[in-house]
Each structure stands twice: as C-alpha cells, then as structure tokens.
Amino acid sequence: MNLYDVYPLFDINIVKGQGCKVWDDKGQEYLDLYGGHAVISIGHCHPHYVEMLTNQLNNLGFYSNSVINKLQVKLAERLGKASGYEDYQFFLINSGAEANENALKLASFTNGRTRVLSIEKAFHGRTSLAVEVTNNPKIIAPINDNGHVTYLPINDLEAWEKELAKGDVCACIIEAIQGVGGCNMVTQEFAQGLQAACKKYGTFLICDEIQCGYGRSGKFFAHQWLGIKPDLITVAKGIGNGFPMGGVLISPEFTPVYGQLGTTFGGNHLACTAALAVLDVFEKENLVENAHEVGEYLIAQLKELQKRNSHITEVRGRGLMVGAVLDIPHKEVRSKLIHEQHCFTGCAGTNILRILPPLVLTKENVDDFIGRLETVLKEV
C-alpha cells in the first residue's frame, strides 16, 4: 500500500528534536521557526513533558469517557486558572477542526439557527462544518458546500452588523490573528463592536484560538488583547505540544445535555497528561511572557531588516505569530532557508513567510534567524 499523496514534501527526514532545533537522518541541525504548524509550544522533547508522558504510559494510556478521568478535571481547573476562564466549561476532543465542529454545533443547538459569518481568507479546518467556514473553495467538497456561510472582510464592522441585523445568524467565527490567511489582525474596535452586535441579535461569538492562542500572542489567548470575552473558544495545536488534542471552552450560558456531544479518544489519559505538562512548563518557565518579550524583539528585528532589504514590504503579527510580507514569491526564499541555511519557516498565500516558533525561542535564536534570512534575501 502507498500513502495517499496529498502533501508536497521537502526531501528531508526529521528524526530528532530539542527545544527550537531539529535534526534530520543525516545529522544536519535545523533552526525550527515553524514548530510543525505552531504545534510545538514548550519546545521539542522537553524533559518534563517526556517524563510525564512516559510515566503515564507506564500506568494507563487510554480508557473511555464512560468512567471518571480525574486528569480531565485537573486539566479543566488548571486551564481555567491559566487562561482567566475559571467560570467556563471545557469539552475535550482531538484536533482543531473537531473543536470548531463542536463549537458550531453547540451554537446551532442552542439558538436553532444555521447561518454563520466568517472572515475572508479564514481557515478553520478540513472537516464538514469547519471546512465550510474556511474561505477556500479548493478544499470544500460539494457535500460540504451547503450555503450556510457568508464570508466578510476583516475589520469591516458595518458589513458584519448588516448581516447580523437579519436576525438569522447562528454564530460569528473569527481568528484574532489569522494563520493561513496571512497573519492579518482583528482590531479592538472591530472585535468589541462585533461582540456587542452578536449580543444584540442573539448570535454566538466563537474565537478560534487554535493557532494564535495558547500563549503564542503574548497573552494566553490572542483575543485578550482585544478586550472581548467570546461565548466559545476553540483550542488545539499548542495545548498538547505535539500530542493530538483539542478543546472547546464553553461559557456558562450553555447547558450540557447527555449525549449532545461525544468523542472516543478525546480527553484520553495521555492527552491530558501532555496538556498538564505543557501548563507546568508554561508556569515554571514563564512562556507566555517570553512569547511577548521575544516576539516584540523578533518583530523589531524584522522591521530593521526591512529597512536594509526591500524584499520585505510589511511585518505583521504579535508575539511569536509573525508574518513577513515579501515582494517576491515565498517559494524560493523558503527553499533556500531550508536547504542552504537549514532553517524551517512556514508560509501563507504566495508571498508571506509565516514564523511560528516554539515559545521557548530566545533572542539569540532570533538573531541567528535574522542572519540566515538576510543572507537569503540578498541572493534572491
């Protein structure tokens, strides 16, 4: 049997990781400024993480949600305190797409509506509802194209209010900082106006924090820079530092019903242990604060590089979620960074470098990256 070939791959086999570095099967070291799509939060193979998962695996890896799992309760309590959402409820699943699916289902269950507003260039996942609110026709199959979603420009409050006033919108789903969309940022004025309009018209506000959340922006959640409190918050990626996990933070206004939502693997013992290890390291190593401090330094250094090299036309983002907009396609730049400078970055669109490193990134790592990027930009 062959793999179903849907991923355009770099010819590199990564076999080892530590902190912000990874190594291939030939022993070549790489600086990791992408963290596997913003998944790696506390660094590759953090010793506390490895120890906790190993110990848990020696006891119990999995049992079903038909019995008590005190690790789930502990995680919900810890996450509530860390994020400032102690009064919310927590539903555990396996991925970001699944988190968005369940958030949208909860909203629709509660207000009985079916229409959703989503931001242009949004990406919320590849499963049924999640892909429908994703603004990319290439990945929406006919079976998913049900006409439930209206895509609107980011930060155009008037356009959103006009749609909400129709009184039939189930939910608005937004990323405070767009990921695949290119690190575009929601403004405070738009976010607060949207929240007020949602409350006025009986619409639920969902914040997708799967990529921009979990400390990456320099606050626990990126929407906390905007002064809003969403009805539903979706998390994944950094929550498990590579272990598949997702969740929905659910406001107290939602009343749970037996059988309403469910999952086989979600919230399993290993996943909860991974998430608890992440929170331990967040607290011990002050990683949210580090993301803010080192992120500001990264953005400042990219803007200095922009002054020296005209290929960078704009620097976007916050914390350790940063986009460098280029006046040339990113393809050659990324290829040279990987194959010649041995540095991983991501991309968005056709001309944006997306930088999503582990939150343990240091200023020395930033200086190292800027040097490698400058070398490449001089050559292209």
Q: For each predicted feature, which ranges?
A:
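Conserved N-terminal phosphate-binding loop of PLP-dependent enzymes in the Aspartate aminotransferase
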Residues: 1-380
